[in-house]
A protein has these predicted regions:
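Long, terminal "pre-/pro-" and other extracytoplasmic accessory regions
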Residues: 2-8, 13-179
Length: 179
C-alpha cells in the first residue's frame, strides 16, 4: 500500500475544511450565527444600502471571521472592479473596504456579478420581499445567480434557530409594501 505524504494529507484536509462564499453553512456555524444576526443592530438590508458607496452589491452575508462577527458585502464598480466591504454590524458604518483581486473570492464575485446581469431589482429588495413573506425572520445572507435566463437571489433567513431559504426572482418587478 503506497504511503501518502503528510503534507498532501494536510493540504487535502485544509481544502475540504475551507468554505467558499455561498456554500452551505454547517450546524455549528448556524448555531454560532443565529444569535449574532438576531442581536445585530444593523440588518442585511441596511448593510447593502451602506455598501452602495463602493459599488453595486452582488452578495452579502453575516459571518464569523477570526472569531468575530462581521457583515461582508461583495460589490462591483465599473463592471469589473470587485470589492469586499465590511460593514460594522453594530454601527452600520463601513469598517473596511478591500479590492478582490484573485483566487476563489474573485471567481465567486464574478459569478455573483453574472447573476445580477438580468436583474431589474436590487438585492436589498429581494431581502425585503423574503422577510415580508417570512415574518419574524432575519436575513443572514443573499447571493445572486443566473438560472434559466433569470437573475435570482437566494436569501437565507433565521428565526431563533429555525433556518429557511427563499429564492426571489430579480427580473420580475413586484411592488413592496413600505415598511
Amino acid at each position: 500500500m503506497p504511503m501518502i505524504p503528510a503534507a498532501v494529507l494536510a493540504a487535502v484536509a485544509l481544502s475540504l475544511w475551507a468554505i467558499p462564499v455561498g456554500a452551505a453553512v454547517n450546524e455549528k456555524e448556524k448555531a454560532d450565527l443565529a444569535p449574532v444576526v438576531t442581536a445585530a443592530k444593523v440588518t442585511l438590508e441596511q448593510g447593502l444600502l451602506t455598501s452602495k458607496q463602493n459599488g453595486k452589491p452582488i452578495s452579502a452575508k453575516f459571518e464569523i471571521e477570526n472569531g468575530k462577527p462581521q457583515l461582508s458585502i461583495y460589490t462591483v464598480k465599473d463592471g469589473s472592479k470587485y470589492f469586499e466591504v465590511i460593514v460594522d454590524h453594530s454601527s452600520g458604518a463601513i469598517a473596511k473596504t478591500e479590492p478582490i483581486t484573485g483566487g476563489d473570492d474573485l471567481a465567486n464575485a464574478k459569478k455573483q456579478n453574472d447573476g445580477m446581469f438580468r436583474a431589474t431589482r436590487e438585492l436589498r429588495e429581494a431581502v425585503k420581499e423574503a422577510k415580508r413573506d417570512n415574518p419574524g425572520y432575519n436575513a443572514v445572507s443573499v447571493l445572486s445567480e443566473i438560472k434559466d435566463s433569470h437573475s435570482l437571489a437566494t436569501v437565507t433567513l433565521v428565526k431563533d434557530n429555525d433556518w429557511k431559504t427563499a429564492v426571489i426572482d430579480l427580473t420580475v418587478y413586484k411592488p413592496l409594501i413600505k415598511e
